[in-house]
C-alpha cells in the first residue's frame, strides 16, 4: 500500500509538471490525470474499478471509481496535449516515424485506432492518433490529417523517414508526403504497377533471404521511387518502395516492427487496452493518450535501467523482458511503496532518449 503522504506527493509532482507543459488545463484536472495514470501503471488494466483500487483517497471505492470514469468522460486531453508532454523525450536530430493501425471488437462495436508515432527505445511512441468510425482500413484524408497536425510541432526537417505497411498506399498519399518533404519507406502489394509492370513479375524466383532491387527508380503510385524486394523465411514476398538507398530500405523498414511492440505493450501483454468497456471515440482517445504517456515513461525508465543493469537473456538469446516491462517494474515499486526513487524516474520523463544509432550496411544490387 502506498503511504498517503507519498501518494499525494507523487501525484502533485506529476501534476505540476503536466501544468508546465499544458498550462491551459486546470491543476485539479491534471492531478486526477496523474492519479489515474499511476493507477493504470499498477493495475495493468483499463477497467475503472481495477484502476480505482490503486488510487489512495479518503473516499469510498465507488466514489473513486466514479472519479476515474469522469477523468475519461470529461477531461479534454487531446493527442496534441500528449504530444506536448512527450516532446522533451525526443532526442535532437532527425527521427524515424511509423504509421499503423490497431483494431479489436467490443461486442458489436469495432474499435479502430490510426496511430502515428516516433521509433525510440524499441517501440513507437504515439504522438498523434485518430479513432476511426469503422473497423476497416484508414482513409487517405485521415492519414494526411495526422501528418499535417504533427508537422505543426515537428517540422519536416526533423523527419528522417515515414515507415508504413501495405495499407498505406495511394497516389494522392504518396504525392502529399513528397510535397511535405518527407521521405517514404512503404511496403507495397505484389500487384502494384511499377511503371507498366506488376511488381510480382519484376521480382520472380526470389530465394529466402535474397535481396533484389530495380536498377533505377520506377514510377510507384505516381512517384519515382526505389523498390527493393526480399523473401521472408516463411516464403512471403516483401516489396518496399522508398526514397532511401537500396541497402538502407529493408534495414529501415524492419523498424516498422517497433509499432507492433507498442501495441503489444498496450494491449494483452501489457496495459490491457482491450479490457476497456469504453467505445465512444472521445473517451477511447483519452484512454489511448494516457496509455501513451504510461508507455513512454515505462520505456524511458526501462532504457535507463538497462544501462545500469542489462536485461537478462533467456536460453534462446532473446531478452527476458521488454524495455517497457523492465521499466514498469521499477515505476510500480516506487509508487506502491512510496520510495524516493520515484523522483529519479520522474526526471527521466523530462530527459530525452538516447539518439537512435544507425547500423551501417554494405550496398548490394541484384
Language model features: what each stretch is:
Residues 100-113:
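An active-site-proximal beta-strand-loop segment
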Residues 61-74:
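Major-groove recognition helix of helix-turn-helix-like DNA-binding domains
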Residues 1-46, 53, 57, 75, ...:
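Single, function-defining residue in the core of a domain
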Residues 90:
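Acidic-basic catalytic patches of nuclease active cores, encompassing PD-(D/E)XK
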Amino acid at each position: 500500500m502506498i503511504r498517503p503522504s507519498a501518494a499525494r506527493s507523487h501525484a502533485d509532482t506529476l501534476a505540476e509538471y503536466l501544468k508546465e507543459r499544458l498550462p491551459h488545463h486546470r491543476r485539479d484536472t491534471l492531478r486526477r490525470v496523474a492519479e489515474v495514470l499511476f493507477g493504470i501503471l499498477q493495475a495493468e488494466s483499463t477497467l475503472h474499478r481495477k484502476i480505482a483500487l490503486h488510487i489512495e483517497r479518503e473516499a469510498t471505492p465507488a466514489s473513486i471509481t466514479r472519479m476515474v470514469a469522469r477523468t475519461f468522460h470529461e477531461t479534454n486531453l487531446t493527442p496534441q496535449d500528449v504530444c506536448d508532454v512527450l516532446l522533451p523525450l525526443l532526442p535532437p536530430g532527425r527521427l524515424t516515424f511509423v504509421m499503423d493501425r490497431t483494431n479489436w471488437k467490443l461486442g458489436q462495436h469495432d474499435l479502430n485506432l490510426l496511430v502515428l508515432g516516433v521509433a525510440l527505445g524499441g517501440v513507437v511512441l504515439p504522438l498523434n492518433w485518430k479513432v476511426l468510425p469503422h473497423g476497416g482500413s484508414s482513409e487517405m484524408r485521415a492519414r494526411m490529417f495526422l501528418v499535417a497536425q504533427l508537422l505543426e510541432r515537428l517540422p519536416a526537417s526533423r523527419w528522417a523517414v515515414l515507415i508504413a505497411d501495405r495499407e498505406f498506399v495511394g497516389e494522392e498519399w504518396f504525392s502529399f508526403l513528397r510535397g511535405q518533404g518527407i521521405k517514404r519507406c512503404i511496403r507495397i502489394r505484389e500487384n502494384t504497377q511499377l511503371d507498366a509492370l506488376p511488381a510480382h513479375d519484376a521480382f520472380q524466383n526470389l530465394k529466402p533471404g535474397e535481396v533484389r532491387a530495380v536498377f533505377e527508380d520506377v514510377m510507384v503510385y505516381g512517384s519515382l521511387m526505389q523498390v527493393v524486394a526480399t523473401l521472408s523465411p516463411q516464403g512471403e514476398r516483401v516489396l518496399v518502395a522508398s526514397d532511401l538507398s537500396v541497402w538502407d530500405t529493408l534495414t529501415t523498414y524492419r523498424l516498422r516492427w517497433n509499432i507492433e511492440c507498442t501495441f503489444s505493450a498496450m494491449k494483452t501483454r501489457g496495459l490491457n487496452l482491450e479490457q476497456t468497456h469504453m467505445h465512444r471515440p472521445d473517451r477511447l482517445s483519452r484512454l489511448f493518450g494516457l496509455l501513451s504517456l504510461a508507455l513512454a515513461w515505462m520505456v524511458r525508465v526501462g532504457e535507463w535501467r538497462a544501462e545500469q543493469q542489462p536485461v537478462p537473456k533467456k536460453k534462446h538469446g532473446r531478452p527476458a523482458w521488454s524495455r517497457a516491462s523492465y521499466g514498469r517494474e521499477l515505476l510500480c515499486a516506487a509508487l506502491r511503496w512510496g520510495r524516493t526513487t520515484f523522483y529519479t524516474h520522474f526526471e527521466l520523463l523530462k530527459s530525452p532518449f538516447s539518439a537512435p544509432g544507425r547500423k551501417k550496411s554494405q550496398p548490394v544490387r541484384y
